[in-house]
Amino acid sequence: MRTIISLLLLSAMVFAVIEAISLEEGLQLFEGERGCVGENQQCADWAGPHCCSGLRCKELSIWDSRCLG
């Protein structure tokens, strides 16, 4: 019985890791498709500000907004 429970837990952990990797790859692909921009680049605001992962759009002035960490 302990062996079965251990195998089930191990399977669940492996599945969770595989799902996390797949999700991360999917997010990276989505960022490329929507035209994310890197640090200190002007925010891509055609459909709302889109900065790459870990960055956020910071409004420096009325006319200038940049992606910053």
Curated annotation (Swiss-Prot):
<comment type="similarity">
    <text>Belongs to the neurotoxin 01 (U2-agtx) family.</text>
</comment>
<feature type="signal peptide">
    <location>
        <begin position="1"/>
        <end position="20"/>
    </location>
</feature>
<keyword id="KW-0800">Toxin</keyword>
<keyword id="KW-1015">Disulfide bond</keyword>
<keyword id="KW-0964">Secreted</keyword>
<dbReference type="GO" id="GO:0090729">
    <property type="term" value="F:toxin activity"/>
</dbReference>
<protein>
    <recommendedName>
        <fullName>U5-agatoxin-Ao1a</fullName>
    </recommendedName>
</protein>
<feature type="disulfide bond">
    <location>
        <begin position="43"/>
        <end position="57"/>
    </location>
</feature>
<dbReference type="GO" id="GO:0005576">
    <property type="term" value="C:extracellular region"/>
</dbReference>
<keyword id="KW-0027">Amidation</keyword>
<keyword id="KW-0732">Signal</keyword>
<feature type="propeptide">
    <location>
        <begin position="21"/>
        <end position="34"/>
    </location>
</feature>
<dbReference type="Pfam" id="PF05980">
    <property type="entry name" value="Toxin_7"/>
</dbReference>
<feature type="disulfide bond">
    <location>
        <begin position="36"/>
        <end position="52"/>
    </location>
</feature>
